[in-house]
Design a protein with these regions (language model features):
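Non-catalytic helical/linker scaffolds that mediate oligomerization, partner binding
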Residues: 5-167
C-alpha cells in the first residue's frame, strides 16, 4: 500500500452488529463488512453476542450478499482455556469468518501458528499510535490495523503512506 496517494483505495464501510436485526439493517443499508462478537473470548461479554449457530447464519447471510464478517476475539485467555480457544478459532475458520479482530499478541501468535491464512485485524485495544507500532503488527501477520483515535489526520496520512497493511 506504499504509494497510497497514487492508488486510492475505496474505504470499507464497516458496521457493528450486536443482533441479527442490527446486522440485517447494516447489510441492507450497504455496508461492506460487519464486526461482531461471539459468546466466547469477546470483550463485550454481557452484550447480545452470537452463538456458533448464529455465527454460521451470519456468515451465510452476509456472504450471499457480498458482505464480509469480522469476529472480535479481543480478550485474554487463561492457560486452562487454551484448548477451548483453539477449538473456537477452528470453528470460526471453518464456517468462513473473513477475519478476526484481536488485541492479544499471544493469542494472535497461536492463531497464526495453527491457521496461518486466517486474516488478523489489530483491534483498537492494541493502541497503535505510531508508524513503528503499525509496522510491528504488520510484521506479526496483521493485514488490517485500527489506529488509536488520538492520532491527527497528518499522523494517519504519514502511517498509511509507509505501510502495506490496511488502516
Amino acid at each position: 500500500r506504499k504509494g497510497y496517494n497514487m492508488t486510492m483505495m475505496k474505504p470499507e464501510l464497516l458496521s457493528p452488529a450486536g443482533s441479527m436485526d442490527s446486522l440485517k439493517a447494516a447489510v441492507n443499508s450497504g455496508c461492506d463488512a460487519v464486526y461482531l462478537g461471539g459468546k466466547k473470548f469477546g470483550a463485550r461479554a454481557y452484550a447480545g453476542n452470537f452463538d456458533l449457530q448464529e455465527l454460521e447464519e451470519v456468515c451465510d447471510y452476509c456472504h450471499l450478499r457480498g458482505v464480509k464478517v469480522y469476529v472480535t476475539v479481543n480478550t485474554v485467555y487463561k492457560d486452562e482455556e487454551l484448548k477451548e480457544f483453539l477449538t473456537y478459532i477452528k470453528e470460526l475458520y471453518e464456517m468462513g469468518v473473513d477475519a478476526l479482530i484481536m488485541q492479544d499478541a499471544g493469542a494472535a501468535k497461536l492463531v497464526r501458528e495453527h491457521f496461518p491464512d486466517f486474516p488478523l485485524h489489530a483491534s483498537t485495544q492494541m493502541t497503535c499510535n505510531s508508524l513503528a507500532d503499525v509496522k510491528y503488527w504488520e510484521s506479526q501477520g496483521f493485514n488490517k490495523i485500527v489506529l488509536s483515535r488520538e492520532l491527527s489526520t497528518e499522523e494517519i496520512k504519514h502511517i498509511t503512506e509507509n505501510v502495506e497493511a490496511e488502516i
